[in-house]
């Protein structure tokens, strides 16, 4: 889709915050240009292009945020959700998407035949899909008078997990640690905060291990060996999630599998 702006060889560098990204959109709009790339400072990418430092200005960010509100929930959610992506080009994709929607109106978000619109749609879908998977597969353990767990997502999905688990566990304190990005979501006394965290020590107490063993035993007990289909299982629960699911640990594949092996040996 054509832009009322020229594509430059300039790289926008910003502080990595969502407010800072909104300021990148503002800068692009005011300069009537599309940058060659948009990079957060902490990524430290080497580029042969000229760089433009984008200073985070809350007033400018608020103006862009109000503009996104006027464009409607589809455009706004695609940008806010897509920003959680770990795709190295997600900022540029979303900036181009925002420019199109500001110029053409909210209906442009449905023009998925356009490569820029389609790329933004794919970002949002990938982030939402991963969040939905983790909502299904997260396994909490009891620790320090609260529930805790560690996950290894590709994208920064903690904000998308917040609503579900706060609603599902209204009276519980809990922590979800994103080991990939070193961020934890802590809910305590019905208040949620995000904090930088380097390491999560799993509960190795005997009581917790006994509960996990019972869950593994249940998982094995309900397995129907004649209908075991690991290819289908991996379609619904991809292997990359298994290390965070206690029933899928190597020790958890035991009871039914051993019974099958024993039956074969008996023959």
Give each language-model segment a name.
Residues 78-82, 179, 228-234:
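Short coil/turn segments at secondary-structure boundaries
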Residues 39-132:
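Charged, alpha-helical interface segments at or near domain boundaries
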Residues 20-31, 95-103, 163-167, 213-220:
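Short, hydrophobic/amphipathic alpha-helical patches that form generic packing surfaces
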Residues 106-199:
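Internal, well-folded beta-alpha domain core
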Residues 173, 184-191, 203-267:
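Long, compositionally biased intrinsically disordered terminal regions
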């Amino acid at each position: 889709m054509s832009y009322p702006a020229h594509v430059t060889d300039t790289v926008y560098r910003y502080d990595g915050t969502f407010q800072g990204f909104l300021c990148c959109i503002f800068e692009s709009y005011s300069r009537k240009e599309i940058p060659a790339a948009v990079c957060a400072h902490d990524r430290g990418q080497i580029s042969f292009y000229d760089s433009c430092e984008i200073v985070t200005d809350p007033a400018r960010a608020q103006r862009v945020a109000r503009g996104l509100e006027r464009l409607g929930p589809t455009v706004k959610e695609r940008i806010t959700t897509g920003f959680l992506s770990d795709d190295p080009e997600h900022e540029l994709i979303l900036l181009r998407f925002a420019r199109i929607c500001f110029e053409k109106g909210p209906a442009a978000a449905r023009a998925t035949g356009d490569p820029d619109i389609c790329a933004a749609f794919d970002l949002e879908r990938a982030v939402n899909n991963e969040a939905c998977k983790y909502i299904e597969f997260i396994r909490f353990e009891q620790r320090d008078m609260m529930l805790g767990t560690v996950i290894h997502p590709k994208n920064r999905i903690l904000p998308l997990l917040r609503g579900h688990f706060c609603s599902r566990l209204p009276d519980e304190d809990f922590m979800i640690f994103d080991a990939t990005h070193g961020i934890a979501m802590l809910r305590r006394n019905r208040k949620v905060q995000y904090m930088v965290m380097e390491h999560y020590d799993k509960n190795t107490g005997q009581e917790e291990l006994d509960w996990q063993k019972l869950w593994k035993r249940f998982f094995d007990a309900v397995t129907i060996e004649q209908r075991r289909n690991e290819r289908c299982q991996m379609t619904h629960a991809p292997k990359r999630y298994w290390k965070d699911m206690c029933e899928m640990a190597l020790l958890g594949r035991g009871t039914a599998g051993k019974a099958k092996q024993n039956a074969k040996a008996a023959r």
